[in-house]
């Protein structure tokens, strides 16, 4: 008989046998199946077989940290909430304490290559070295996180190298002859070959990701969004990024069209694309971009659109031009004066690097100028007879006793952090007045404190203010919008999700009791997330997170995320019709407002919470299974990932947009993606009208999904959902669509997700009829 020390591993041995017998990798996984694993082999098995041990190790280390920070009772509650499935911790199978996802800035790569991530490659000097180095960057960065990596600057940096090699007007002469590896090629050939090199390389299996492709996201920008995000940014040789806008616009269009056509040759999953579109509340500011987006949807391309009425997700915390600043320039000269005047002085020197005070510490920063926006007057009582009034942008963040609060959300009586020079301590001073300003400015000004420093600086009065993050996404509703919706150097450190359906049913449908229970559970979740954050900070201090050390990601700009799942199912349990109605609106608002208020109350300097309607590719299935096993009401085998029931034919296209609009998501500060499944593509004009409708409703993040058809016999791919191959006549077909956030073959999905796909309602005819009328 085999000794017990070996026999106790029998479950692992059985798992290996079972895994090899299953049809596909997603169906074989016991822990976190996902359709991004396109093949099943010993490499994917090696990744799967150790996951149970990593989960237990993760829970043990979290228990230890929680016990040290909050006591044994809190630590025990963590294990209990996980094991009773009230709470789910995403990617527990990863190496603790890896961060969850990141939208990286590529500037350190431009300066130092991959040396900051432990590589040997120098900074890229040519287009080809950029392309090769970029692929390695994506793999190296992805190895440091549990989930997705976004590189919003990818095309802007590629454009820079194209300009260096072929001139600023290269986009006007794409058919001009050029050389690539000694071959005569056109400039356009070089560009599309580079696209192919990067895209096909990144879609290969990665050893550090369990032999699956990395989750890679990129961004496109309209002109005002781009200028708002990159105003003042210069490449190392002094080239101003915004001066290259027209060539970048051409390159963005070229990539989208190339990628759309390439997907007729292969079903390519990554990158997940997001087009950032600025609106004025009624329409797109950049009409060229609006029409291009609509045309690409009509041509069958699959991408997300993110629309906002400001670039506040990407820049924040600015002051009026006459605000008094005190700084030291690079010559160690103390400069005191109005922000606009100081900026002009630095502009003459062409050096915006400065130093600024934070208490008694001097910290490095960069002086920044950004386009003007809505302003507010904030009056702070420094002393009994000393009041200071500041004119700041509406999204300016003030560190208060209740966390970092935007100017437009400050209220009389809030207390703002202040440096007391006499006693040499930090204290707080009350806000006495908050007034919306009627002033308009071409530009507003602030300082961006260097990565690695606390994100604050001090005004001459002693008031502490949050610094400007030129490439930030601090406040608006963003899909892990921290990822791929425009934000740079951001992301999420950890995501833990509440099962709303279970919580409501455990309270017997009593919503007063459910609200109190949700508030209490969210408070616990915050302590769990803070414990994980402490582990991340400890790892950072020991230089275990090179993404932080090298400046690719700013830890102070990463969220601790509270996820939700089972919202639709909870409403159904309560007998509330899931749709655009008063009862459902009040229910969703109660849930999201409760979490949002707790997020605000528990925030503190260096700790930001947000709430996300998580995609839940595997969690939607798990929660349904766990709840059903415990005798709870479970209406479907996979919980929804949207504010509507995905199979409901009564929910129109316009309903879906409204259900993901301001009326429902105003307190969902971490984002949700509205997936609109269509039977067939619409016209460009119809898509344009839908985008305008999304702007009107405040639906900020959305995409349209029409299944692609793949012939399993001849390999032909169509952008349409067909019943027979138009090339060979075969009915042996596969389909490709978004399982949640990314495009894959349905045949690669888990059995439960395949069943969920079969139930999806692919509508759109009702909208076509409305549009025609």
Question: Which stretches of residues belong to each language-model region?
Answer:
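Conserved catalytic cores of very large enzyme subunits
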Residues: 2-318, 468-556, 577, 581-735
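Contiguous, well-ordered alpha-helical segments that form the cores/surfaces of helical PPI scaffolds
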Residues: 560-573, 593, 738
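Residue-level marker of positions within ordered structural domains that often coincide
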Residues: 223, 403, 450-452, 503, ...
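Metallocofactor- and cofactor-centric catalytic cores in central/energy metabolism, strongly enriched
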Residues: 189-192, 573, 758-761
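Core of folded catalytic or high-affinity ligand/protein-binding domains
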Residues: 555-556, 560-563, 753-754
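A short structural micro-motif
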Residues: 201, 742-745
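Autoprocessing domains of the Hint superfamily
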Residues: 319-468, 644-728, 733, 737-739, ...
């Amino acid at each position: 008989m085999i000794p017990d020390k070996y026999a106790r591993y029998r479950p692992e041995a059985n798992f290996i046998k079972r895994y090899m017998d299953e049809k596909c990798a997603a169906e074989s996984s016991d822990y976190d199946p996902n359709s991004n694993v396109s093949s099943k082999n010993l490499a994917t098995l090696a990744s799967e077989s150790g996951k149970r041990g990593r989960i237990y190790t993760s829970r043990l280390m979290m228990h230890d940290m929680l016990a040290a920070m909050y006591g044994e009772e809190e630590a025990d509650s963590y294990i209990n909430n996980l094991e009773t499935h009230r709470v789910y911790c995403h990617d527990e199978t990863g190496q603790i304490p890896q961060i969850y996802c990141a939208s990286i800035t590529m500037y350190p790569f431009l300066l130092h290559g991959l040396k900051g991530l432990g590589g040997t490659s120098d900074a890229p000097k040519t287009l080809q070295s950029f392309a090769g180095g970029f692929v390695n960057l994506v793999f190296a960065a992805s190895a440091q996180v549990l989930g997705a990596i976004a590189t919003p600057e990818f095309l802007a940096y590629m454009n820079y190298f194209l300009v260096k090699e072929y001139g600023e007007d290269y986009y006007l002469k794409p058919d001009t002859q050029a050389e690539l590896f000694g071959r005569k090629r056109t400039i356009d050939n070089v560009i599309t070959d580079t696209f192919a090199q990067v895209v096909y390389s990144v879609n290969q299996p990665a050893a550090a990701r369990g032999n699956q492709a990395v989750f890679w996201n990129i961004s496109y920008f309209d002109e005002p969004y781009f200028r708002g995000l990159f105003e003042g940014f210069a490449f190392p040789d002094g080239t101003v990024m915004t001066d290259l806008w027209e060539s970048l616009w051409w390159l963005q269009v070229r990539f989208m069209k190339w990628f759309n056509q390439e997907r007729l040759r292969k079903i390519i999953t990554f990158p997940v694309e997001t087009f950032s579109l600025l609106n004025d509340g009624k329409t797109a500011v950049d009409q060229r971009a609006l029409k291009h987006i609509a045309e690409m949807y009509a041509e069958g391309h699959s991408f997300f659109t993110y629309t906002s009425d400001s670039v506040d997700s990407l820049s924040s915390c600015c002051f009026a031009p006459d605000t008094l600043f005190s700084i030291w320039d690079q010559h160690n000269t103390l400069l005191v004066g109005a922000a606009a005047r100081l900026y002009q002085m630095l502009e003459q020197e062409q050096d915006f690097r400065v130093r600024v005070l934070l208490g008694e510490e001097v910290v490095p920063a960069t002086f920044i100028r950004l386009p003007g926006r809505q302003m507010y007057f904030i009056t702070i009582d420094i002393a009994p007879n000393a009041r200071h009034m500041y004119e700041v942008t509406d999204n300016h963040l003030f560190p208060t006793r209740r966390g970092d609060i935007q100017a437009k959300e400050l209220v009389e009586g809030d207390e703002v952090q202040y440096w007391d020079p006499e006693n040499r301590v930090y204290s707080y001073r009350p806000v006495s007045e908050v007034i919306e300003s009627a002033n308009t400015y071409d530009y507003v000004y602030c300082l961006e404190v260097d990565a690695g420093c606390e994100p604050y600086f001090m005004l001459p009065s002693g008031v502490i203010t949050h610094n400007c993050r030129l490439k930030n996404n601090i406040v608006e509703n963003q899909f892990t919008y921290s990822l791929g919706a425009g934000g740079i150097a951001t992301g999420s450190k950890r995501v833990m999700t509440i099962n709303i359906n279970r919580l409501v049913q455990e309270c017997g449908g009593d919503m007063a009791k459910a609200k109190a229970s949700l508030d209490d559970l969210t408070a616990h979740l915050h302590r769990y997330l803070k414990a994980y954050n402490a582990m991340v900070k400890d790892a950072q201090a020991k230089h275990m997170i090179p993404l932080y050390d090298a400046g690719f990601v700013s830890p102070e700009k990463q969220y601790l995320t509270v996820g939700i799942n089972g919202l639709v199912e909870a409403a159904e349990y309560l007998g509330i019709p899931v749709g655009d109605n008063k009862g459902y609106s009040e229910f969703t608002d109660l849930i999201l407002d409760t979490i949002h208020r707790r997020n605000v109350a528990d925030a503190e300097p260096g700790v930001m919470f947000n709430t996300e309607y998580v995609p839940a590719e595997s969690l939607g299935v798990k929660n349904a299974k766990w709840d059903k096993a415990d005798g709870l009401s479970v209406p479907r085998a996979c919980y929804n990932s949207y504010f509507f029931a995905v199979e409901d034919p009564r929910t129109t296209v316009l309903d879906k947009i409204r259900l993901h609009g301001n009326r429902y998501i105003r307190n969902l500060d971490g984002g949700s993606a509205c997936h609109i499944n269509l039977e067939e593509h619409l016209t460009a004009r119809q898509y344009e009208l839908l985008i305008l409708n999304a702007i009107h409703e405040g639906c900020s993040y959305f995409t349209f999904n029409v299944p692609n058809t793949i012939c399993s016999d001849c390999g032909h791919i169509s952008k349409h959902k067909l019943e027979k191959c138009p090339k060979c006549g075969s009915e042996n077909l596969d389909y490709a669509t978004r399982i949640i956030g990314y495009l894959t073959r349905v045949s690669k999905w888990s059995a439960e997700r395949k069943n969920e796909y079969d139930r999806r309602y692919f509508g759109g005819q009702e909208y076509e009829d409305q549009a025609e009328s």
